[in-house]
Amino acid sequence: MFDGQNRTHPARGLRAPSLRGCAASCVASAVAVALAACSALGTPRETPSPLPRAGAPAPGLAAPPREKRGATLSRALRPVLPRGDTRLAVAVLDLDSADQEIASYGTGTTFETASIIKVGILAALLLQAQDEGRELTVDEREYAEAMIRTSDNYAADVLWHAIGEAEGLGAANERLGLYSTRGGPGIGWGLTRTTATDQVRLLRAVFARGPRASVRPPEGLDQASRAYIGHLMGSITDEQDWGVSAAGSRGSRWALKNGWLQRSTTGLWIINSVGQVTVHGHRYLVSVLSGGNRSMEAGIALVERAARAAVGAASAHVRPWPQ
């Protein structure tokens, strides 16, 4: 069943579903309870793939050669790597670097998303609305806000059906350059499988500035859609402040989405966190995925240590100008 951290009542304050496929969502919601135990916590906190420059770099020293970035990240993560059956994958990107590269650890390893997939669901919904030349309806916006800000699972059920479930998600992923993400079976959106690198690609599609935010710009999220997702990720409820936000500079704004799921077969936890943080004036996109954690608390501690190490490695070349 869903974890107890999702304190918002599924339907409280929301209108009755008026979206395509909502007739099935009530039945689907009950089935989804047996498949995923997902939630999120937050507020305003491969081989590396070459990415186009998103804007002028902030003052700093030259970035390390791209072939060394993965090795630098692996070295930084060494002290925090889990033991036993716990698995970890991390990816990080300096959005304001002149020579952008995704540095990754655990390349190609897939994890179940839990509630971080809610960002992908919203991205797919917005792409479909763009294609239809319309804005989101009042109901869609209410569901989107509940799904991202409070990680409401019923809202995710409704919007998962609205986008066409795994097929609709897959179409959006292709447009946004996510190559290793596969939608969960049936109504099991929380069982979608993804990689840390793909999640940074999705974050780049949201947070990069200008038309280069998408691998295929004419077909990606437009400026209004990116701003909307970023706003919701930056206004997650205060009680949900954990995960990659721990890696940001004190007092800086951040945006994130977390997810967790306890597997009924093993009792072990999947703990994931994705988002944007700012350090030394640079914006970093961070994705930390983990599985096989003995408890939710242990998983959160691991994710936060990994996020700090990843941003530390990525920001080692950045130094503020002397005053």
Q: PLM ranges: what are they?
A:
Residues 2, 39-88, 93-97, 161-323:
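Penicillin-recognizing serine hydrolase domain
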Residues 2-29:
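N-terminal export and membrane-targeting signals
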Residues 34-37:
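C-terminal motif of bacterial Sec signal peptides marking the signal peptidase cleavage site
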Residues 94-102, 121:
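Short, glycine-anchored, charge-dense loop/turn motifs used at functional sites
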Residues 99-107, 254:
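Amphipathic coiled-coil signal-relay and dimerization helices
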Residues 105-111, 185-188:
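A short glycine/serine-rich beta->alpha loop
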Residues 110-134, 147, 286:
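Active-site SXXK
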Residues 129-179, 195:
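Conserved catalytic neighborhood of penicillin-recognizing serine enzymes
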